[in-house]
């Protein structure tokens, strides 16, 4: 029988808090499967890492009065010790805040920009005059504009699953000081997802590429037409700086997308 080459990972735990039961369950189940593959003689590598960038880490670090770098270092040690205490054996347990990740994020971005798949334009965003900063993602909370659920973040509703712009929140408040934000313009960078819609749409039709349920969901998005994706965040922000830009950072979702590539 031909030996298989396998690269295995689990969902990356976020670096703003402790491991929970769901992380541990997934880790143990995956470890059992990986051990079997190795015993069967397959070339199998088990990787995972802490998800470190973004506003939740910044907020958690601010509460502890330490830097984001100090927080992710402390949490990484805690996560690794907890997971390995359950005899979960990773070939590598790392961090998204790594020099390798920075290198490949910059390389992919520069390639996309060189081939005209990056655009830029000025957008209007929520801005806190008290804290002197823009309020992306979890720096702003309010009422969901889709379902009316209270206390929702600016990057999406945890009740109805809708995505929206932070400035669309109803009765929004800065997550740091609680004040009502205003609006301010800033230049942002966008990845032209629509440039790849035809190629992606054709690729998923192959039954060997994706599960039918995944294909159906993707076709829902394709039927609406892929839109440009905002890949930038204004400083202060904990993440990788965008090459050639001043005080602009890759959003944490962008870095994850580049990792997947």
What are these regions (language model features)?
Residues 1-48, 95, 100-104, 147, ...:
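Structured secondary-structure scaffolds
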Residues 32, 70-81, 107:
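A non-catalytic, amphipathic alpha-helix used as a structural packing/dimerization or gating element
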Residues 43, 89, 118:
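Residue-level detector of anion-binding/catalytic polar loops
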Residues 50-56:
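Short, charge-patterned binding micro-sites
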Residues 60-73:
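A charged helix-plus-loop insertion that forms the helical arch/lid used to bind
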Residues 77-91:
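A glycine-rich helix N-cap at a beta->alpha junction
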Residues 116-190:
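Cys/His-rich short segments
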């Amino acid at each position: 029988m031909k030996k298989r080459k396998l690269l295995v990972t689990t969902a990356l735990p976020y670096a703003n808090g402790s491991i929970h039961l769901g992380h541990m369950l997934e880790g143990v189940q995956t470890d059992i499967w990986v051990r079997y593959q190795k015993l069967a003689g397959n070339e199998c590598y088990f990787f995972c890492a802490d998800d470190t960038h973004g506003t939740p880490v910044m907020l958690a670090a601010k509460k502890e009065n330490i830097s984001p770098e100090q927080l992710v270092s402390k949490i990484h040690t805690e996560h690794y010790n907890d997971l390995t205490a359950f005899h979960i054996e990773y070939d590598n347990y790392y961090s998204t805040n790594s020099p390798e990740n920075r290198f490949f994020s910059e390389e992919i971005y520069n390639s996309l920009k060189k081939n005209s798949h990056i655009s830029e334009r000025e957008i209007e965003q929520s801005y806190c005059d008290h804290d002197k900063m823009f309020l992306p993602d979890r720096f702003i909370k309010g009422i969901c504009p889709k379902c009316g659920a209270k206390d929702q973040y600016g990057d999406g509703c945890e009740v109805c699953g809708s995505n929206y712009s932070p400035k669309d929140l109803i009765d929004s408040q800065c997550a740091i000081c609680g004040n009502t934000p205003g609006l301010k313009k800033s230049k942002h960078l966008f990845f032209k997802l629509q440039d790849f819609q035809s190629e992606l749409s054709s690729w998923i039709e192959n039954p060997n590429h994706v599960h039918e349920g995944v294909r159906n969901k993707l076709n829902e998005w394709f039927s609406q037409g892929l839109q440009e994706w905002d890949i930038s965040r204004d400083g202060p922000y904990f993440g990788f700086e965008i090459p050639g830009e001043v005080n602009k950072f890759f959003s944490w979702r962008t870095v994850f997308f580049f990792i997947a590539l």
